[in-house]
Regions:
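Non-catalytic connector elements of ABC transporters
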Residues: 95, 105-200
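Small-residue-enriched segments and motifs
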Residues: 32, 86, 100, 143-146
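Alpha-helix N-cap/helix-start and coil->helix boundary motif
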Residues: 52-53, 85-86, 97, 177-180
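ABC ATPase nucleotide-binding domains
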Residues: 1-84
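Alpha-helix C-terminal capping segments
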Residues: 38-41, 92, 100-102, 134-136
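C-terminal boundary and immediately downstream tail of ABC-type ATPase nucleotide-binding domains
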Residues: 80-103, 128
Length: 200
């Protein structure tokens, strides 16, 4: 089919979820073949996908759709490492979004009794906490493990603050070999310089 498309000398190629119905092994092989095939095409290619890895491997720039509106086009590296919106942050895999508000010393996270040394974007903000910013430690903030999820490659602990059962939950990937159980109380530090924030 692609050979017929290129034979017609198109000015633009649109690929709409080209691998959505394929298993992982077949998808990977076809993706490599498609990349080789399209390397000779000099025109623009519009690639629609919900797979971030697929986009990262195949595209130089990206435009995210958020509630039917297109966000500004950005390069893939910027999207992955410096997502500009909450929608973009969710797309690249961030899972922890905590409500906070401006206070003396930075941003106070609602329910967690923690103040992050961040310059607040507004009076009320949403703070995105990458899992890499959560460091389990002997001292620091305390949290209770409310759930343990054993995934294919990782073990994830879902945390809530000891003092507030209604606060927003925090998801952390446990170091290999660390065992925790529901109800355990653990301590952690938070690397504020890795966190992102937006006006709420």
């Amino acid at each position: 089919a692609l050979a017929r498309i290129l034979a017609s000398e198109p000015r633009v190629i649109l690929l709409d979820e080209p691998f959505s119905a394929l298993d992982g092994f077949l998808k990977w092989n076809l993706e490599m073949e498609l990349a080789d095939f399209l390397s000779d095409f000099s025109g623009p290619i519009l690639w629609v996908s919900h797979d971030l890895g697929e986009c990262f491997r195949s595209c130089r720039s990206v435009c995210i759709m958020d509630n039917g509106a297109s966000l500004p086009v950005t390069d893939m590296e910027t999207l992955v490492h410096h997502p500009a919106t909450q929608c973009a942050a969710r797309l690249v895999g961030l899972r922890n979004f905590l409500p906070g508000r401006r206070c003396e010393g930075g941003v106070r996270i609602d329910g967690w009794e923690m103040v992050l040394p961040l310059q607040a974007a507004s009076e009320q903000v949403t703070v995105a906490v990458p899992e890499s910013a959560i460091v389990l430690a002997r001292e620091g903030y305390t949290a209770r493990v409310c759930r343990v999820i054993r995934d294919l490659h990782d073990t994830v602990a879902v945390l809530r603050p000891v003092q507030d059962a209604d606060a927003q939950l925090l998801r952390v990937v446990l170091p290999e070999g660390m065992a925790v159980a529901e109800g355990d109380v653990i301590s952690f530090a938070l690397l504020a310089d890795q966190c992102l924030q937006w006006e709420r």
